[in-house]
A protein has these predicted regions:
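Short amphipathic alpha-helices within nucleic acid-binding modules
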Residues: 23, 84-89
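Short, charged/polar surface micro-motifs in flexible loops or helix N-caps
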Residues: 51-55, 63-65, 83-85
């Protein structure tokens, strides 16, 4: 018996909810599946990751003050079919890779883009094992 069954969602706090949701939708293709206000007054948006059950929960709690991304929180990673094709998609949106593409010793290729609020996104093109 496993202790947990699966990862359900990851929560990120942001200053500009609509700008962040637009980025994840337009750039990465995530779908907004739920939006509501919590009893404590924060606004919540759940985004579905394509091809999986995992979600990203984006929250904005204005009374909490400006968001400061912790230096140790480095990135979210998403798999893509082709870094070259994804770079063309990004170019159409006026976005460039902030780092990479780079190839690991196992042949996996990866690159990074900057997301709103100081978060970073890793894009991985797998080759064989990760």
């Amino acid at each position: 018996m496993s202790i947990v069954n699966k990862l359900l969602h990851t929560r990120y706090r942001v200053n500009d909810l609509d700008r962040t949701v637009k980025f994840y939708s337009d750039v990465l293709g995530l779908k907004e599946i739920k939006r509501h206000k919590s009893p404590r007054g924060s606004e919540l948006v759940f985004l579905q990751v394509p091809g999986s059950e995992e979600q990203i929960e984006i929250t904005c709690f204005p009374a909490g003050g400006p968001v400061q991304v912790q230096p140790d929180l480095t990135h979210l990673a998403f798999e893509v079919e082709s870094l070259e094709e994804f770079a063309q998609h990004l170019a159409g949106l006026g976005i460039k890779y902030s780092d990479g593409p780079t190839t690991s010793s196992a042949g996996t290729r990866f690159a990074f883009i900057d997301a709103p609020e100081g978060y970073e996104i890793e894009l991985i093109q797998r080759r064989g094992t990760y």
